[in-house]
């Protein structure tokens, strides 16, 4: 997969945000146990599981997935100037994204996500990475793939020298707390590729795992800047699952104010 030797940007991020991800050999990210996943009470001579146990186990299972945030978006947070500027143009959309990020643990525990539909340059990728950063800072496991890169990674998993075989790689993609998919539908998948995407999305749907995605394609009803809808590009089965998992947040140019974004609980 090529993740064993991270580039400079990836190393820098792992030294920063990613050192907060729970690991089997790391100290407790919550500071509640000694790093072994158990909270002991010397007075009663008892022990109870630490909440980091579940995240440590997930971190082990999802090692090897791509999870770096690109340099362009690494500084993006809830109150970044770029987010504030976007909020002036698309208040409902930014409010939905912020609400999701502020309640990241609850959202991931429920398996809810968001889908950002919009023209290039409207801020959808920025909001997606704002959410992913919140998940990382909360100690949750994440995987970040562009649609073309994900398809390439699936093909690579068939190679004899692959770090993870096909089955193991798909299991990791299903198991990670948050899967961010950028440019979903950027290329028309073959029948084989469409089936792989369905297996991933359906697996996450059944496991109540969150998906945050971005796409330049129109909403299911045809609303948006592109002639083709996301459902037409990736297929009705995948779109049906995503529709339940990740409510669409439209960001289409000058018409942003006229759209309604989902109001998360």
What are these model-derived regions, one by one?
Residues 28-71:
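Interdomain "pre-motor" coupling segment immediately N-terminal to P-loop NTPase/helicase cores
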Residues 82-114:
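Pre-Walker A (pre-P-loop) alpha-helix and adjacent loop at the N terminus of AAA/AAA+ ATPase modules
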Residues 89-95, 136-175:
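Short glycine-rich substrate-engagement loop in P-loop NTPases that contacts/grips substrate
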Residues 106-128:
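Walker A/P-loop nucleotide-binding motif
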Residues 125-140:
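P-loop NTPase Walker A phosphate-binding motif
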Residues 140-141, 175-178, 207-213:
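Loop/turn-to-beta-strand initiation segments
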């Amino acid at each position: 997969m090529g993740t064993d030797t991270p580039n400079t940007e990836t190393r820098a991020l792992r030294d920063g945000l990613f050192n907060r991800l729970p690991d089997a050999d790391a100290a407790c990210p919550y500071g509640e146990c000694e790093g072994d996943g158990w909270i002991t009470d010397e007075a009663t001579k008892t022990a109870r599981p630490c909440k980091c146990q579940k995240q440590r186990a997930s971190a082990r299972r999802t090692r090897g997935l791509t999870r770096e945030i690109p340099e362009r978006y690494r500084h993006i947070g809830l109150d970044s100037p770029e987010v504030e500027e976007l909020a002036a143009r698309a208040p409902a959309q930014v409010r939905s994204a912020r609400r999701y990020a502020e309640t990241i643990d609850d959202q991931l525990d429920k398996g809810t996500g968001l889908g950002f539909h919009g023209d290039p340059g409207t801020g959808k990728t920025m909001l997606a990475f704002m959410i992913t950063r919140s998940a990382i800072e909360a100690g949750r496991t994440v995987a970040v793939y562009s649609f073309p890169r994900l398809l390439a990674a699936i093909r690579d998993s068939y190679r004899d020298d692959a770090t993870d075989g096909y089955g193991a790689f798909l299991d990791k993609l299903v198991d990670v707390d948050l899967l961010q998919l950028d440019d979903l539908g950027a290329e028309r998948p073959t029948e084989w590729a469409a089936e792989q995407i369905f297996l991933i999305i359906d697996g996450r749907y059944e496991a109540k795992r969150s998906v945050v995605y971005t796409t330049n394609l129109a909403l299911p009803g045809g609303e948006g800047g592109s002639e083709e809808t996301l459902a037409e590009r990736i297929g009705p089965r995948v779109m049906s699952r995503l529709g339940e998992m990740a409510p669409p947040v439209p960001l289409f140019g000058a018409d942003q104010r006229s759209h309604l974004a989902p109001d998360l609980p």
